[in-house]
A protein has these predicted regions:
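Solvent-exposed loop segments that connect transmembrane elements
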Residues: 1-30, 67-123, 167-178, 216-233, ...
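Transmembrane beta-barrel wall of Gram-negative outer-membrane proteins
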Residues: 1-67, 135-138, 185, 196-210, ...
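Structural signature of Gram-negative outer-membrane beta-barrels, strongest in the C-terminal barrel
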Residues: 44-48, 193-196, 202, 208-210, ...
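Repeated loop/turn-to-beta-strand initiation elements of outer-membrane beta-barrel proteins
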Residues: 50-53, 148-151, 200-203, 254-257, ...
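Membrane-embedded beta-barrel scaffold of Gram-negative outer-membrane proteins
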Residues: 140-144, 150-166, 313, 319-329, ...
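C-terminal beta-signal and adjacent terminal beta-strands/loops
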Residues: 377, 486-498, 525-579
């Protein structure tokens, strides 16, 4: 990391640490590593010829650094969205730290930054960790009452704790620091009744119950001295239960009808509290009596989700199918609200999906070709967006419901075995999006030039192809090299209003990842007894730089765009023992 220009001149009144004092390159911390240990055990007891009991338990321990965040773009000085950053520099940055927060902190490499996890103003540290401790237990009892009736009960409990610290300013200046501790525990119970009737109907009916408690403690500092330095404690309890029935009826030996319906009752309650680092109340705002008096946000919804479809087995090598299905994603609350106006909940989103296609095999099963065409209608689709603060003081980020959007596309997958030991597989996807009704979301339908606005996290084209060849080494086992390539077209990570960017140099579209291709490879050796296999693998062979996600904060006044950069070229070895 090169020395930071401009740091250390006489106005500096707080020591920014090693990243400031070093005159040469230095590495003071790391991001994006992996360190996970996990285990799972299962016990099967044949209690009687008709009853099986299964017990399982798993545990995961993760102790690693935070994700590879990269500060990739800085605000445009003198523009309206630069006001907050420039005011903070004038009021806090230069007087206290002796330097403005600006593009001097952009590094040339996508894998370096000037992050530091200490706030010298408050004296707090925000550890660069991403730790998880998780365990779960489950039990299932299956009772075969008769050849036509089976009953199964599944009971499971799971809990985890996640602790992580992060900073996203790309600088040693404590502009945006958070420390989070999240806890979750859940209990589920499901009863399934399955059977066969009339010698043509396979049916399933059941009941599902879910209850969970969540909590999030956060210590956060955002533009200290201007916005907040606060401790927050949010909790949520959720209850969900459902009944369902599903059946497949063989109309003929070749034609089958599938139908089902599910009724769901979903309820959530959230409790919100806020106070300053010194323990005092934050200023009262609408929705809170005071910031330390919890605000309660309830939401309760019900949903009916039917499905119906037909499939026709033309012959042993060709299956035709057509389905209509519905679904929903439950409502909730905007994460970590900072004022009462953000306490409003958002509703469930609903989906109507139509699809049809075929599954086929050709040339004596040497080629498998499957195709699916779909058309989907979303109503009240949930979108996450940010806004410039208006006169009401509404929070920048909030989850909202859009009106209606449509998606249609095609998916094709092929698997070929043209000669002995050679396997080739490929997938192709195309999806078209159209926002037909923005509702109250503020999303744009089209830009001023008539181009349609972008769908969030939806690449238009995806394509993947891979191939492997197995070499028989006789009494030394087998050796199989494999190569894979994956392409994804341009993707936009946040929804846009028509005025947030127009793709010109002075005002570029934010939160974009251009199309890219990633190539991976591996060589696998399998022992003659197949008890052992060893893989030498390479990920991102061409060392392509791309981002798994971006969070554009320039247009909403927070002065930067940050991203989660994907790993560079990596090599590794895995060893597996089969028992």
């Amino acid at each position: 990391v090169p020395p930071i220009p401009g740091l250390g001149f006489p106005g500096l009144s707080i020591d920014l640490g090693s990243a400031v004092n070093e005159t040469g390159n230095c590495v003071v911390d790391e991001l994006g590593n992996e360190n996970v240990q996990s285990g799972r055990a299962m016990l099967l007891w044949h209690a009687s010829p008709e009853i099986d009991v299964t017990l399982s338990a798993d545990v995961t321990h993760q102790h690693q650094k935070g994700p590879a965040d990269k500060y990739v773009r800085y605000y445009r000085p003198g523009t309206p969205e630069a006001g907050l950053s420039e005011f903070w520099n004038f009021a806090v940055g230069v007087p206290i730290f002796g330097v403005a927060w600006d593009d001097r902190f952009l590094t040339d490499s996508p894998y370096t930054n000037y992050n530091r996890y200490v706030d010298p103003v408050s004296g707090r540290t925000f550890p660069n960790v991403n730790d998880v401790d998780e365990y779960g237990i489950a039990g299932a009892v299956e009772w075969q009452i008769s050849p036509e009736l089976n009953i199964k009960s599944i009971t499971a409990y799971r809990e985890f704790k996640n602790s992580f610290g992060r900073t996203s300013s790309g600088s040693p200046i404590p502009l945006d620091l958070t420390w989070d501790v999240t806890r979750h525990d859940q209990l589920t119970q499901e009863f399934q009744f399955t059977g066969r009737a009339f010698d043509r109907l396979d049916w399933t009916a059941g009941f599902f119950y879910y209850t969970a408690d969540d909590s999030n403690y956060q210590s956060g500092s955002l533009f200290p001295g201007v916005i907040y330095q606060q401790d927050s404690h949010d909790t949520q309890d959720a209850t969900n239960w459902a009944v369902f029935v599903h059946g497949v009826y063989d109309i003929t030996d070749q034609l089958a009808l599938t139908a089902g319906i599910r009724y769901t009752d979903d309820e959530k309650n959230a409790y919100i509290s806020r106070h300053n680092f010194d323990g005092t109340d934050r200023l009262p705002v609408p929705g809170f009596t005071t910031q330390t008096s919890p605000g309660l946000v309830p939401i309760a919804e019900t949903n009916w989700s039917p499905t119906v479809g037909l499939d026709y087995q033309v012959n042993d090598n060709l299956l035709l199918f057509a389905f209509y299905s519905t679904g929903f994603r439950g409502g909730g609350f905007s994460p970590r609200p900072a004022n009462g106006l953000q306490l409003a909940n958002f509703l469930s989103e609903n989906l109507d999906n139509y699809e049809g296609g075929f599954k086929s095999e050709w040339f004596e099963h040497r080629l498998r070709l499957n195709t699916n065409v779909f058309f989907s209608i979303y109503s009240d689709q949930q979108v996450f967006r940010g806004d410039l603060p208006d006169a009401s003081g509404a929070q920048w980020f909030h989850q909202i419901n859009s009106g209606e959007s449509e998606y249609w596309g095609v998916e094709v997958e092929a698997q070929a075995n043209p000669i002995e030991n050679l396997m080739i597989d490929s997938t192709l996807g195309y999806i078209h999006h159209e926002l037909t009704d923005p509702g109250f979301s503020g999303q744009c339908v089209e830009f001023a030039n008539g181009d349609p606005c972008y769908s969030t996290r939806t690449p238009e084209f995806t394509f993947a192809i891979g191939g492997s060849y197995e070499f028989n080494l006789g009494d030394r086992g087998t050796l199989t090299p494999r190569i894979d390539a994956r392409y994804q077209s341009k993707i936009y990570f946040l929804p846009y209003t028509a005025d947030l960017g127009n793709n010109v140099a002075s005002n570029p579209i934010e939160g974009v990842q251009e199309g890219y291709t990633v190539v991976n490879g591996r060589i696998t050796w399998v022992s003659p007894s197949t008890d052992w296999d060893v893989q030498l693998y390479a990920v991102n062979l061409t060392d392509k730089v791309y981002f798994n996600g971006k969070l554009p904060l320039i247009g909403i006044g927070l002065g930067r765009e940050q991203g989660n950069v994907a790993p560079p070229r990596e090599f590794g070895v895995t060893v597996t023992r089969h028992f």
